[in-house]
Curated annotation (Swiss-Prot):
GO terms for cellular component: COPII-coated ER to Golgi transport vesicle; endoplasmic reticulum; endoplasmic reticulum membrane; endoplasmic reticulum-Golgi intermediate compartment; endoplasmic reticulum-Golgi intermediate compartment membrane; Golgi apparatus; Golgi membrane; intracellular membrane-bounded organelle. It comes from Homo sapiens. Residues 1-156, 214-219, 263-292 are cytoplasmic. Interacts with HTR1A (via C-terminus). Interacts with ABCB9 (via TMD0); this interaction allows (but is not essential) the ER-to-Golgi trafficking and strongly depends on a salt bridge within TMD0. Keywords: Acetylation, Disease variant, Endoplasmic reticulum, Golgi apparatus, Intellectual disability, Membrane, Phosphoprotein, Protein transport, Transmembrane, Transmembrane helix, Transport. It is found in: Endoplasmic reticulum membrane; Golgi apparatus membrane; Endoplasmic reticulum-Golgi intermediate compartment membrane. Changing residue 123 to Q: In KABAMAS; decreased protein abundance. One of its GO terms (biological process) is sperm flagellum assembly. Residues 15-25 have a biased composition (Basic residues). InterPro entries: Yif1_fam (IPR005578). This is Protein YIF1B. Functions in endoplasmic reticulum to Golgi vesicle-mediated transport and regulates the proper organization of the endoplasmic reticulum and the Golgi. Plays a key role in targeting to neuronal dendrites receptors such as HTR1A. Plays also a role in primary cilium and sperm flagellum assembly probably through protein transport to these compartments. It is a multi-pass membrane protein. Belongs to the YIF1 family.
Length: 314
């Protein structure tokens, strides 16, 4: 057909235009599974509404966690093994603590390390200047001595332990400056100091037993009081390294007198405590022995201080 005829026919008879039909894909509602899906997709469970509960107002709440009973039922073997292992560990810890306390009083040792910086400073001042101190009584609270950090007169193990370690280090320094250092010699220095301390404690305990002294002075108290002499020994050796023998003898002499006064005033209250409480005169024969014992212990401290340090200064 001619194009002009086609145009005329189109003008005379209007034709309906066909639009392509659009097929709408149904939107799946939350919680509805895809009919073409064989298995549930658990990886996107939270996006489909399984991981949270929705309130009527649109607020979502987190999913409830499984209860311990449900967790136990899920894996009973491992949970029973874990519970059994925890029970064994607790029983073992209790048994070890009980056996350790039988030989080493851990709970009592905690008292002797209950110190702070202020106590250490005041105690060191008391060891170097005991002449300025007036009240030497140990404070008690409900028949129990207060912690050392609250009472400068209470014995502690922190200062003696640190002083002993520092003494060994200073001895190694002194031997090194004299080209005499060796691990064996340093070990001999430490073991000899520890051996003398052990002999002191045993001798005092035996003397207290022979004199039949009823005192609250314990073995740990003796170790604490006898360990304070290492502080003066450190000062003497350091002054000897800096100023020679003159500085050594001056500082060590001062520390020897100070430790003698400190031990007399401290042990006198411990050893003669029962006699003073009973009102027994100090001039009695029994109390005279106690006074001699106190003076002997105090006099032994300067002698040991010199014996353990004189060879370190040249």
């Amino acid at each position: 057909m001619h194009p002009a005829g086609l145009a005329a026919a189109a003008a005379g008879t209007p034709r309906l235009r066909k639009w392509p039909s659009k097929r709408r894909i149904p939107v799946s509602q939350p919680g509805m599974a895809d009919p073409h899906q064989l298995f549930d997709d658990t990886s996107s469970a939270q996006s489909r509404g399984y991981g949270a509960q929705r309130a009527p107002g649109g607020l979502s709440y987190p999913a409830a966690s499984p209860t311990p009973h449900a967790a136990f039922l899920a894996d009973p073997v491992s949970n029973m093994a874990m519970a059994y292992g925890s029970s064994l560990a607790a029983q073992g810890k209790e048994l070890v603590d009980k056996n350790i306390d039988r030989f080493i009083p851990i709970t009592k040792l905690k008292y002797y390390f209950a110190v702070d910086t202020m106590y250490v400073g005041r105690k060191l001042g008391l060891l170097f200047f005991p002449y300025l101190h007036q009240d030497w009584e140990v404070q008690y609270q409900q028949d129990t001595p207060v912690a050392p950090r609250f009472d400068v007169n209470a014995p502690d193990l922190y200062i003696p332990a640190m002083a002993f370690i520092t003494y060994v280090l200073v001895a190694g320094l002194a031997l090194g400056t004299q080209d005499r250092f060796s691990p064996d010699l340093l070990g001999l220095q430490a073991s000899s100091a520890l051996a003398w301390l052990t002999l002191e404690v045993l001798a005092i305990l035996l003397s207290l037993y022979l004199v039949t002294v009823n005192t609250d002075l314990t073995t740990i108290d003796l170790v604490a009081f006898l360990g304070y002499k290492y502080v003066g020994m450190i000062g003497g050796v350091l002054m000897g390294l800096l100023f020679g023998k003159i500085g050594y003898y001056l500082v060590l002499g001062w520390c020897c007198v100070a430790i003698f006064v400190f031990m007399i005033r401290t042990l006198r209250l411990k050893i003669l405590a029962d006699a003073a409480a009973e009102g027994v005169p100090v001039r009695g024969a029994r109390n005279q022995l106690r006074m001699y014992l106190t003076m002997a212990v105090a006099a032994a401290q300067p002698m040991l201080m010199y014996w353990l340090t004189f060879h370190l200064v040249r």
